[in-house]
Amino acid sequence: MSEYLLLLISTVLVNNFVLVKFLGLCPFMGVSSKLESAIGMSMATTFVLTLASVLSYLVNQYLLLPFELGYLRTMSFILVIAVVVQFTEMLVQKTSASLYRALGIYLPLITTNCAVLGVALLNISEKHNFIESAIYGFGAAVGFSLVLILFSAMRERLAAADVPLPFRGGAIAMITAGLMSLAFMGFTGLVK
């Protein structure tokens, strides 16, 4: 049980997919200007990332490995992710039309979010079992959500701040992301 907790903590804080592995930077920079959009994107990504992790594990274990189709792994994972994202998009559209409009193009872009595919592929390369795959996917999603929401809150404050002209917009956002990454480096010794 403790190894599962360590896997979750290390995935969320120590090996954060955005700040350490630099995966998922497109939605990180694109959706983080408003807190409401960031929270919606976080919920959608958490659902997609966790479900895609589990389904990718099942496809790999029960379809690709028995039939020796390992060379189709990346393509099949992309297909699994696309199906999960389409399902999520339909679910969000039915349950919250305002969130669906707020997320706009970023919801279908979860399909091309490299963090989702990265987690699925890392689950296989690190030889996680079913439970570890689910925890790893959920931890990656929680880490992504944590960073996205924190960064979004900081960007909203920066929009109201008196930032020098050359640093406005993307420049101050990149500086803030770098400082945030340095802050997360403090968790490095937390899990061995």
Curated annotation (Swiss-Prot):
InterPro entries: Ion_transpt_RnfA/RsxA (IPR011293), NqrDE/RnfAE (IPR003667), NqrDE/RnfAE_oxidrdctase (IPR050133)
Enzyme class: translocase
Localization, UniProt: Cell inner membrane
Membrane protein topology class: Multi-pass membrane protein
Source taxon at top rank: Bacteria
An annotated GO cellular component: plasma membrane
EC number: 7.-.-.-
Ranges that cross the membrane: 5-25, 39-59, 65-85, 102-122, 134-154, 171-191
Protein family: Belongs to the NqrDE/RnfAE family.
Function: Part of a membrane-bound complex that couples electron transfer with translocation of ions across the membrane.
Name recorded for this polypeptide: Ion-translocating oxidoreductase complex subunit A
Organism this protein belongs to: Shewanella sediminis (strain HAW-EB3)
